């Protein structure tokens, strides 16, 4: 019996492994919440994570940047399933119905810029999401500027948008906390 259970679990884990995983349930106000999505060149299986399959490594890296961007965070807050306080539960239909950056529509130059950014930031230590927003953490700003640039925003529009979004989202998350 034990061997069949192990075999069954191996099959389950094998089916769920992916190089991109997205948090299914998280507390945006928690000090430990630093990212919402994670890339691994070796397929992984995360507890309470959505496994996102079917993408090559480059596209998965671009999606990881997107899922961790402030635009995606805004989208999550607007369409969230609130559980308690700043806890958010992300359902599969929310991922499927959300707006996403499409790597297939990017130019080679845009892809290169995003992949270069990913490589530069992949070992960078990040504070919590709330601290990133409140303190305009430089790496979050770089991610957001890169995402907004490939979406067609110019520098002035980007700065105006981020000047509005960072304090607004900080306030929203802090209010959810109470």
PLM features: residue spans?
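Polybasic, glycine- and aromatic-enriched phosphate-binding surface used to engage nucleic acids
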Residues: 1-116
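Non-catalytic DNA-recognition/assembly elements of restriction-modification systems
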Residues: 104-178
